[in-house]
């Protein structure tokens, strides 16, 4: 996607004093224009929203590319011209000390650069392992632009973990983390476990695991948070959707023997009284071996984190002359070798805790602002970092958390169920 000119991004807050809208509204500034984000509530219509903000119906409809038929929960972006309103936003006196623990591998990069005779060429060389950390850091930096304009004071301490347990122990012993309010990272689970054991029950802190699938660090650690939605929570999202949309359908749960426990858990979550459920241990995944075991129309669930197994099953199902709706886990999104046309053909659904859609106003504003600042398209790591900063520093509700278990940390349960439509990920409709 090309660089979008003339856009820049600024998050502000505006508090409406009328009983018509008693919650904070995001106020967004794009290309010298203020927009107030309004969430449509029960009983509201385009006319009374227009009167409240003193903005014409035509202007609201043009800005949001919508019709006069609104629905509860819909986000509208209201263009605002009133000078008194522009200056009436809240400046915060909040302060945060934040530790960002990322694997930059600076030591390895220094060694790599030193090996080049041409120092100008060496400056452009970055060890591939560092790419994720650098992209994550860009998301944090972009969020800081907005956060600091709100008057929120951020003291950021960036620490290179090198993805090395010995280095992480050294950081913990240094006590540099003792005074932090937020600890973001480490990225990898074994290092997250070390930090959690030291600070996981410190009520003055929040420890955030941004990417890891492992939930071990949450156990008996009440100040910990996991952004990547765990399997059991993904199972609930899938089962709730199936029971609402595909009640009384034939369901087959295909699993690898090593992941039988995942299949059993998924089976328990589904309503056996209204669905015919079959579990199948897929010892063989070749099309000729399993073709006869599937019906003409069927719901297929692949509760697996095994890349090879999921890939083989999707390839095999794509070659069977039946109509399937397939449900899998969020890891499907990371398998970049999969054929999107086959995913569309199989109507593959999966929960996505990191869902991004450039056609959604909130996400498009992030995209345009990021491109304006860095002259490149943001990666998913930049988007995750930005959302974490905005959620925990600005109280923008990017996530929804629930207890992992009693006396433990919290997990993100806001994972949209998505499917590919016209080669783009879209939210699945009930």
Feature locations, PLM:
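Bacterial Sec-dependent N-terminal signal peptides
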Residues: 1-29, 419-430
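Structural motif
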Residues: 154-174, 235, 283-294
